[in-house]
Curated annotation (Swiss-Prot):
Keyword Hydrolase: no
InterPro entries: cDENN_dom, DENND6, Tripartite_DENN
Domain uDENN intervals: 43-221
Entry keyword set: Cytoplasm, Endosome, Guanine-nucleotide releasing factor
Principal place of residence: other
Cited function: Guanine nucleotide exchange factor (GEF) for RAB14. Also has some, lesser GEF activity towards RAB35.
Chain ranges of the dDENN domain: 375-499
Annotated GO MF terms: guanyl-nucleotide exchange factor activity
Location of region: Disordered: 1-25
Designated name of the protein: Protein DENND6B
Gene name of the encoded protein: Dennd6b
Keyword Lipid biosynthesis among UniProt keywords: no
Residues of the cDENN domain: 246-373
Family classification: Belongs to the DENND6 family.
Biological source species: Mus musculus (Mouse)
Length: 585
């Protein structure tokens, strides 16, 4: 059914975000920062409604003094509603990702470093994009001129906690649509009482009479393919709703129509290939895009991705231009117009209407891109790409057997997730081993010389090492692994992985160098040194200490204390005038 959508978004007057007193609120906020805890989870909450004269309209933004640019407001308005052709009646949940525009966002800016240093790379805060989690309701309503009630509640965050925020919306949105503004204000105040998301901690998050219990993943977690065990309930009343994950989707449900091509899709993601996912609705498109981008874990997905994208997006021209090669982006769309617009893209995945029966849906077929010409294109993976690795038939048999035996979908998802995790690890482990061999030996790190350089990554040397230490040691899949690595070297994911590993190794080298200095006899070193050399040492030690205290260097607390003691000792040996310069009152 087609429900018309108006010409475009506008800022609607009124609403909670517009009527709240800004002067007193800002003064209090500056003094007490009452939204600091809220902003550790969310940037803001938006309500988008359909106005007969204005089209999609931003009814309110809360907290009211959170600043969105006009371009961001317009993007949120369009992305918060399904395309008119999809005709989503009832309640629909989906997500989107949009680029931030510059400028200060709020009075209570969050420092990302503490969280990002401990979080898995794939779950770090987005530095330049907003993630929008949408609950859209469209129902018949005779009291409205058009005959339909159409409204979206949107949680805007920089955290990729799709499972948590979808669960949160399923509690908040139905209540909000009944009670409107006062309910939303109460919810935001409750979130402002939550503890910050600290990686490795299990948190109890009270909301609307319910307690949601979640564990925030940590970088040091052992990668598991099964859900974590339920934590102690701590005699909480009411008993908490335990989320087994803040971010993991039901992979089996997402990949059901494309299970026979999971291997090929994994390779396309690994290589950062441009891919369009054309789905019948934004919930299907956004979940499949997020599932695709998650299948490389523990690798961080380094390309752009848009779980739901529309022709009204401010970046539409930039991402669909034919004057240059398609960008490294995964686009989730629902408008068939994109088939014509993106004919030049090398890979298009067309998904049909989801089947809710227990049987496995008809699998999409591999088709040549040349057949992608009409708006009524049939479901299929349109690509000329040939997979480097052979298909894992044993996995497909196990999943098919699970369907026949009506195995729970969460168990099916765990099987699929473990397969993808082991596949990615088998690919990455040889790279990790080779990279580790480029690290200088600890015996070559001396206190009074600059630390040695990390050896350069030589692709030919690495490829030669695969004969004895390749993925065949941990993976039964056969195929052209060498060819896959060669293509991987040209991808954004190799660049992202290498930069991250090189940065970590450089920090480790610097930390080892600091430890070597702290274990040396500094009095003996100072005996024949000029004042200039001693002052230079103080300045360098201070710089290292600041970096270490800011968690940019992996050093122990005892090393930090010893470094500070060394600085004090060295300064104490200098003339009073220099001491006054180095330690001003």
């Amino acid at each position: 059914m087609e429900v018309p959508v108006g010409p475009g978004p506008r800022q609607a007057g009124g609403g909670l975000g517009a009527t709240r007193s800004s002067s007193s609120g800002r003064a209090a906020r500056t003094a007490e920062m009452p939204w600091a805890r809220f902003s550790a989870w969310l940037e803001c909450v938006c309500v988008v409604t359909f106005d007969l004269e204005l089209g999609q309209a931003l009814e309110l933004v809360y907290p009211s003094d959170f600043r969105l640019t006009d371009k961001e407001k317009s993007s949120i308005c369009y992305l918060a509603f399904p395309d008119s052709h999809s005709g989503c009646l009832g309640d629909t949940q989906f997500s989107f990702r949009m680029r931030q525009c510059g400028g200060q966002r709020s009075l209570w800016q969050v420092d990302d470093r503490s969280y990002n240093n401990k979080a898995p790379l794939a779950l770090q805060r987005e530095p330049a994009h907003y993630l929008g989690y949408v609950y859209f309701r469209q129902v018949k309503d005779s009291s409205v001129k058009r005959g339909y009630f159409q409204k979206s509640l949107v949680l805007v965050s920089r955290l990729p906690f799709v499972r948590l925020f979808q669960s949160l919306l399923s509690l908040i949105a139905p209540e909000y649509f009944e009670k409107l503004a006062p309910c939303l204000e109460a919810v935001c105040n409750e979130i402002d009482q939550w503890p910050a998301p600290v990686p490795g901690q299990t948190l109890n998050l009270p909301i609307m009479g319910v307690v949601i219990q979640v564990r925030i993943p940590s970088r040091v977690d052992k990668l598991e393919s099964s859900p974590p065990k339920q934590c102690d309930q701590e005699n909480l009343l009411p008993a908490p709703v335990v989320l087994t994950s803040v971010h993991e989707l039901d992979l089996f449900r997402c990949f059901r129509p494309v299970l026979t091509h999971v291997q090929t899709l994994w390779e396309l993601m690994l290589l950062g290939e441009p891919l369009v996912v054309l789905a019948p609705s934004p919930d299907v498109s956004s979940e499949l895009v997020l599932a695709l981008t998650s299948c490389l874990q523990p690798l961080k997905f380094c390309c752009d991705f848009r779980p739901y994208f529309t022709i009204h997006d401010s970046e539409f021209k930039e991402l669909t231009t034919r004057t240059q090669a398609p960008p490294n982006v995964v686009l989730g769309v629902t408008n068939p117009f994109f088939i014509k617009t993106l004919q030049h893209w090398p890979h298009v995945l067309r998904i049909g209407e989801p089947k809710m029966s227990g049987d496995l849906p008809k699998q999409v077929k591999l088709k040549k891109p040349s057949r992608l010409k009409t708006l009524d294109t049939k479901p299929g993976l349109y690509t000329s790409y040939t997979a480097h690795l052979h298909r894992d038939k044993a996995l497909l048999k196990r999943l098919l057997k699970g369907v026949q035996k009506k195995r729970p979908w969460d168990v099916q998802s765990a099987l699929l997730r473990r397969h993808l995790l082991e596949l990615t690890q088998s690919f990455i482990i040889p790279l990790e081993h080779y990279m580790a061999s480029l690290m200088p030996l600890q015996k070559n790190i001396t206190p009074w010389k600059s630390p040695p350089q990390i050896c350069p990554f030589r692709q030919d040397d690495f490829l030669r090492s695969l004969e004895h230490a390749g993925p065949q040691l941990t993976c039964i899949l056969k195929g052209d692994w060498l060819g896959l690595y060669r293509r991987f070297f040209k991808s954004p994911h190799f660049d992202g992985w290498y930069r991250q590993r090189h940065k970590e190794m450089a920090q480790k080298l610097e930390a080892l160098h600091l430890e070597a200095i702290c274990e040396a006899n500094i009095e003996a070193w100072m005996k024949d040194k000029s004042e200039v050399e001693v002052v230079d040492l103080v300045l360098k030690l201070r710089e290292k200490l600041v970096r270490a205290q800011g968690h940019q260097l992996p050093v122990k607390e005892v090393t930090l204390q010893r470094a500070q003691l060394y600085i004090d000792t060295v300064i104490g040996s200098l003339p009073k005038d220099l001491q006054a310069v180095l330690c001003p009152p």
